[in-house]
């Protein structure tokens, strides 16, 4: 697989966002900002946001209670600046996250091979 194919892929998360230009990489960055890196500041990801301000103070496992009647593994509970809306849920599928990471880790081998062949 070529780097451009990895960079422009939408095959894992299938989330192109409101402008239609989203990619797996951009969606992963949005999830990462919500769930771990910048949970209070997600304004870089307008294509995936419903409002100007979003923050996710916590995530919940979608356990046996199936609180919201879908099959995702984890929910990012997202507070927004939208009037009359207490929160939104962003469903996260662990298998998709692992697949995304696996593809990028496997690409490291290609980089190493390229460097070895260059020398």
Model-assigned labels for residue ranges:
Residues 1-8:
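Short, contiguous, well-structured surface segments enriched in hydrophobic/aromatic residues
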């Amino acid at each position: 697989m070529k780097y451009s194919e990895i960079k422009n892929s939408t095959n894992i998360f299938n989330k192109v966002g409101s402008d239609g230009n989203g990619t797996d990489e951009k969606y992963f960055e949005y999830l990462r900002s919500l769930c771990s890196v910048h949970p209070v500041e997600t304004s870089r990801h307008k294509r995936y946001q419903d409002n100007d301000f979003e923050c996710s103070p916590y995530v919940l496992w979608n356990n046996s209670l199936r609180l919201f009647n879908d099959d995702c593994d984890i929910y990012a509970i997202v507070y927004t600046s939208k009037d009359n809306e207490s929160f939104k849920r962003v469903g996260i599928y662990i298998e998709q996250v692992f697949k995304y990471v696996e593809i990028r880790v496997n690409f490291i081998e290609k980089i190493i091979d390229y460097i070895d062949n260059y020398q």
